[in-house]
């Protein structure tokens, strides 16, 4: 197969992916005793498209899958998509709104039908993009968290947990999105710092002329206050504890209580306690057994009658609220109440105050802590009949503590344990239509029945008219079951037996609690074993300035645009469409034009993957730099061109395939073979320990520097001057080292390595399989490491570097050839044929003593070197003097800039660092120029 003159990724990527899939390489065998390797894809939202985080995550997962496949393991990478309850419902509702229709106009069943229609049309975007990234997943195992198989597992888990007393319905404080009309998880809440105010309000002490002044950022919740708290160690207010206060605007009285939650140094030292509208206050109220007074409706407007509850969820009546505020939004109620407080002389002060405002990540509306009826999983209770005597949380804590589940890097264990040891019961219900409908029904009296089907439930309530609960389950509930539901549970399948636990989960740190911990809980509880052995936590991909990539910032990069390239107008359109804050569009356009004046060039999948791998150090966030992607695109070109050179020099010739023919290896051949063994061992260790950054660096250094820049160049000398046995050994080494390097690189750059391997492998006598994907992973043979050859190569490199430095000092252009004289051991004569080529020499000789000439001398190991070139001393002195003068001037200017008062403190850190590096380079250059001038003198 003849290689094209240049590497064009688009010409090979789709072709090879289709071939791999058609050949069945992505599928495991269910009839084998080989060790198994399984990995679960964190299921992306069905609404989503591939972003840089996905590309990063999937590069690591595919790299591991390809690595273990080549090692001979029975590999399975399970793909899937999450139904993404809230996100999907919003998308479809927006489409309906454009037609002037709401979901309520359609009704539940028709609306859900519309969602399924949308999913069938649009839901495959991310899977087609995964193919572009080269993901070798078993597409036959692809699941959707709402498909029949997954839904059966979800229902089964819910029913079993309910029967074990671990699922219950209760009234609790939850994050409530009033615009969506549903509870949301903490992950769907973004707290943003905003300019607000702190109001100081008087609360008169009953039976006294004293008042206490309470500082609050939310005066509209005052109607639901049940107490005012002080710190028990605050001497100023200890005498007030137990006293009653008049609650402004209500006619009620509330007590002063002491609680450690209060920071005596913040505000006035008094804190209003409103447990029905604040999570911290809820905990304070629970400790003091106060009432819960709910003053808001589900649309975040004020009620006419407050609802009063106990912490056990029991209704305790109602309280009339001022009619003037009934039906007002929280913002309007705040204005009205502040005016009334001011008129009553109870508003003391208003101060500017920066505060964190929780907003829904999809709606932007303020999230209200609200008391609502929800379904919960009991996290710290032992299930009925559980022989382990442990809660689902404790089982998950033990799994990590015992080492059955290992975090990489291990510092994330502390984060995991901190969350687990402070866990609250999990709110699993959502007031949506799209999702797994809760398998619970109610009779006319409101009694709940839970079962797998209506028929099963009806048998428990004969003669009763049953109404199904309209809520759906939190998306994270079904995601938590993926390690076993995706493999056929509750049925006992061969896949469950073979692939649980999986070897590793690859994910970001932001979902350790929401997903990782819950998978460990559910799998240990239902299967009695862990879902995975390792959890590899990687950082977040940020933009080049370290900012989080987000649509609102306009700095999102589509990985496919890096693969295929994109013109500037299309890129601007992409970045400014659908902004939550359209007013930011001009700013985004300006930034995009500055960063990508010509758009984004096409880098190809392999360069993108290698870039991602190079960033995959343990747990660190990634500032994505396009220059690195460009560098690795050049690396692909280097690998391609080196292979073309090798093929042109070996094709049709004897490459040492006939083992009976003599082979005469030079020290250069032995050196590259030695380095290859060390590379095989080091890359294997790097991948075994998830150090993709090290693996990519090792491969890059070996291929670019050692193989291409040194060995291939030296092989030219051997092919030109060697005898038949030497040439045969060189050709054999060229192709065999390249073939192994391609296999080592394949997990990171699958497409280019496959294309090149198909050409190289037959000549290396290594084409034992039809694809590099299933070729054997290289195993180092340390007996092939030749220490003597490596030592000689080190000396030779010193010699060549010294020659190059001499050429630089003497200002010799690339076309100028000069004779080299070496004063040193006779063994240096072996190096000279190679040095002639690499040092651009007209001749080279080992002599007893260097000639007496006006030429600089260099030291390399045991040798002294001289390039004998007639130099015009006067002209060279003038040139060096001029260069020294310019360098001194540049050093002086840069030093003055860095010493300028305030520059280092006020200028951007990147700019200061660049200036310091430039100064160091200039200082070094100046020292070298002065040394050259001194030698001439």
From Swiss-Prot:
Catalytic activity: tRNA(Val) + L-valine + ATP = L-valyl-tRNA(Val) + AMP + diphosphate
UniProt subcellular location: Cytoplasm
Motif range ('KMSKS' region): 548-552
An example Gene Ontology molecular-function term: ATP binding
Coiled-coil region(s): 874-937
Main location: cytoplasm
Domain of life: Bacteria
Quaternary structure annotation from Swiss-Prot or TrEMBL: Monomer.
HAMAP family: Val_tRNA_synth_type1
Protein name: Valine--tRNA ligase
Native source organism of the sequence: Laribacter hongkongensis (strain HLHK9)
